[in-house]
Amino acid sequence: MKIKQILYCMLLACFILPASAQNSWGIVGGGLFSKSLSRDARFSLGGYAGGMYDVHVKNSWYVQPQLLFTYEEFRSKTRLGTDSFFSKFNLELPILASYNVALNNKWNLRINAGPYLSYAMFGRDKSIDYAYGNGMHSSLGWWHQDFPDHFTYGGRAGVSLESEHFIYTIDGKCSLRKRPFGQSGSLSAGVGYKF
C-alpha cells in the first residue's frame, strides 16, 4: 500500500510542477536488451514508449520524470534441460536527475541518473522440460492478478544527446528487488522529441 501512495505522489508531482520557458514535454521510445541476473539467463529484446517532462531546476541541472510503457523478456536454459521464458508489460516511472553539458551551439550532452518504480501489469510465462520422461513437457500461460507482487524498483543511469527538439538516449537500469526469476538488468537505446 505504501508503494502505491509513493507512486501516486510521484505522478501528481509530474502534473502540478509549475510551467516555465525552460520546462518542456516530450515523447520517447526505443528498444532494449533485458536479462535476468540469475544463472543461465540470456539477453532478450524488448521495447518502450512514453512521455517525459523536463524541469529546469538551476543552471545546468534538470529533473526529468518519465512515464513509460515497457515490454521485457527473460529467457534461461539450464544444463538440466529446461527452457524458461517470462515476459512482462510494465508501467514504469523513472525520476532522473540530469546535468546538461553544452557541446556546441547545436548539441547538448545530458548525464542522467535516478530511481525508477515499475508496475508489472501482465505477461506470459512458458517452460519446456526436455528431461520429462521420454519426451518433453511444455506449459504456456498468461499471468496478471495471480502474480505475487507487481512492483519492482531500482536505479537507472545513462546519457543523451540533444539537438534542438530531438533526443538520442542510451540507458542502463538494474532492479534492486529480487523477483522469482532473479534481479533484472537492461540496456536501452531510444529517440525522443521535445515539444
Question: Which residues are covered by each model-predicted region?
Answer:
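N-terminal, post-signal-peptide region of Sec/Tat-exported proteins
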Residues: 45-76
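Generic short beta-strand segments
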Residues: 29-33, 69-71, 171-174
